[in-house]
């Protein structure tokens, strides 16, 4: 469990205090994949680097598995950091070392295992990330996705309890991003590893995260289960992320719908209701007609969801709206 208790961070720049993270409290349960999303300068990298004390907080308390990390001395901090792996946007591999030697580096520096034990652990890790036949290659011989897999293997070398991911997929193409996210999901599931990742891409959050915190200007403006936050956004920053992801311009959409007759509603379906024949049933029962103006079906981790924007005319509209609500479908009246 990772817990922030009123943690804040301020930098001193040219004689002025610049707040990077305002007083923040949050909790990440063991085994969760927790996402931090925000635009550049939102404070998400600062928050992530506070977890393993690459940055020291200006105030507040950070507790990991009932241990006050902010109170650790140098020796305790070295011990603690062996329990926390980290992967980076630009991989941070040593170009003069082979893949195997890059993965072995944390174990070599720790000095606790024999050479044969290190070799055995490295072989196991490379097999896990699908690079067993790349051990003797150098980083320059690898693709971006392969480099990040080496970074993941290296981060897992000391058998950490926590994995921190700093924009780990932002330098990768969409197909490679999907394969790396699938690997992270497998690692989380098989090792019960707690993962905290930061990103500016909603698709990353949707694919792998259980919980999400949305950040803006050093403040967590909204947090909760991914489906709750992104299917029913409350804060303007969250709504902007949703609109960017769906490529929606509210002003353009309002103009497009201006001459469409009837009431305009947006329905959000989750789980089994996503594929249920609800529209036809409601139309027959209440006598309404509907036109589909926009729609999508996607998944949040393993849960399907769908969104439809409808123009509804005729019949008993209030009965139709009540029927949608009774079917556990979230309805937003746009006009």
UniProtKB/Swiss-Prot annotation:
Alphabetized GO MF terms: ABC-type D-methionine transporter activity; ATP binding; ATP hydrolysis activity
Binding-site list for ATP: 38-45
EC number(s) reported in the record: 7.4.2.11
Subunit and partners: The complex is composed of two ATP-binding proteins (MetN), two transmembrane proteins (MetI) and a solute-binding protein (MetQ).
Pfam family, one: ABC_tran
Catalytic activity: L-methionine(out) + ATP + H2O = L-methionine(in) + ADP + phosphate + H(+); D-methionine(out) + ATP + H2O = D-methionine(in) + ADP + phosphate + H(+)
Entry similarity comment: Belongs to the ABC transporter superfamily. Methionine importer (TC 3.A.1.24) family.
Compartments where found: Cell inner membrane
Residues forming coiled coils: none
Gene Ontology terms: cellular component: plasma membrane
Membrane topology: Peripheral membrane protein
Annotated ranges, domain ABC transporter: 2-242
Keywords: Amino-acid transport, ATP-binding, Cell inner membrane, Cell membrane, Membrane, Nucleotide-binding, Translocase, Transport
Name of the protein: Methionine import ATP-binding protein MetN 1
Function: Part of the ABC transporter complex MetNIQ involved in methionine import. Responsible for energy coupling to the transport system.
Domain of life, source organism: Bacteria
